[in-house]
């Protein structure tokens, strides 16, 4: 389990799962971040392709929201939490291939640079295409 006092629940293993992480300490309007990993397909050589998705929930809501309107400093702390959770899953379970779908394709190059800066992992090659950022576990 993620060794962090803000981790509320960690139901994941090598086959996917989810993590619930409290973000209340980051902003009074925020409640929970959920990060899921789900196997969606397999490569011809038998490696699993995981889909990664996170959602942010405002305080008292069961409907995820867009937090883009919040101040840059608050979002910087939020991204640190998101990357902490992502780093935990990738480093602990070493999924073969992870797809991070970027919902605004025009921002993929900027988001790719951001991921390279904040989620650089020695066991993974990182690349991108028009809509996704890919983490591919290096062969041993």
Q: Whereabouts are the PLM-identified features?
A:
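Non-catalytic substrate-recognition and accessory regions of acyl/acetyltransferase enzymes
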Residues: 1-140
């Amino acid at each position: 389990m993620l060794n962090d006092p803000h981790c509320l629940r960690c139901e994941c293993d090598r086959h996917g799962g989810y993590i619930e992480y409290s973000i209340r300490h980051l902003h009074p309007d925020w409640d929970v971040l959920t990060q899921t990993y789900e196997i969606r397909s397999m490569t011809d050589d038998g490696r699993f392709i995981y889909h990664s998705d996170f959602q942010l929930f405002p305080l008292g809501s069961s409907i995820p929201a867009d937090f883009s309107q919040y101040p840059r400093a608050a979002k910087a702390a939020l991204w640190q939490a998101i990357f902490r959770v992502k780093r935990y899953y990738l480093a602990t379970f070493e999924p073969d291939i992870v797809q991070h779908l970027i919902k605004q394709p025009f921002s993929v190059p900027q988001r790719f640079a951001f991921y390279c800066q904040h989620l650089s992992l020695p066991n993974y090659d990182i690349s991108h295409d028009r809509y996704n950022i890919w983490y591919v576990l290096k062969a041993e």
